[in-house]
Amino acid sequence: MKKYFFLMAAIVCCAITASAQDAQEDRNRTYRITLGNVQYAHHDEKMSAGEAVGKVLSGVLTGKTEVQATKYEEDVKNAIIKGLSSAHRYRYNDGLLQLDDIVEDGNLVADAVITNIQAKSDSRTWKDKDDKTQVTTTYKGIVEAMVTLKDAKTGEIVANPTFSGSGMGSSSYSDSDKAIRDAINRLSNRITEWLNKYCPLQANIIEGAAAKKDKQKEVYIDLGNSEGAYTGLHMGVYIVKTIAGREAKSQIGKLKIEAVEGDDISRCKVQSGGKDIKAAIDAGEQLLVISID
């Protein structure tokens, strides 16, 4: 009888361990993402001679011009692919797999409409030291796209974000090509950032490391090489509570991975919230760590 109870206890223990391991692996499960249709809204547009003259005259009068840069259509498509490929938890399907082979739960198909590929020029005149009139022209690139993300299994639209490769942080250049290529790179980065927020990496604080007085300086988290951790990754720290049967998260700090020390462990520097993080660890609070890059 004792042997029976010991055997049952061992089975239960193994089942609990396996379940915990499955949950650990499933929290950062990776998904496939496939690029479906890509359209350029201005693909078939052709400017008449009169329109071209009008653009030139407008530029002369105002010092500003705006022209669709249609020749960069393929570059923008490649930037969209790069953006989809660079996300933490998505693996880009490069066409080797048919759509029928990627219909597992969570996999996505992305259709894109490129709405704008534009170079804006701004000219100003000024006098040099010899009192000669000089003209300086600067260019700003703007690239915009709308991406429709659909569930690969059901075809249901799950998100419809719009991305822009310009904005307040965009740079001006003396060359239109450089301006547009900078905007294209920014577009790619925006797509990756959005996907990383939509489906972030998750971890738990497993131990407090260095501390000073009442502030936590370093912690260890259960995220390592096997789940895509890397040095420099920023992560938010959240207290998790259950309120009226619902999970509620409240951010109390921020971490930065200083060293990936194994398949499932990394050492992190506490960048903010050290006092609250230490208090939560000491109180045995449940802390969730979520990537914010």
Feature roles, as predicted:
Residues 1-4, 20-21:
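Positively charged n-region of N-terminal signal peptides that target proteins for export
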Residues 4-14:
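Sec-dependent N-terminal signal peptides
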Residues 19-87, 164, 199-205, 209-218, ...:
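A structural "domain/chain start" motif
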Residues 21-28, 152-231, 236, 242, ...:
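C-terminal/domain-edge helix-coil "capping" segments
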Residues 28-39, 90-148:
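A short, hydrophobic beta-strand-centered structural micro-motif
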Residues 54-66, 124-135, 244-245:
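Flexible, solvent-exposed loop segments that connect beta-strands
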Residues 242-252:
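Short, Lys/Arg- and Gly-enriched loop/turn segments at beta-strand edges
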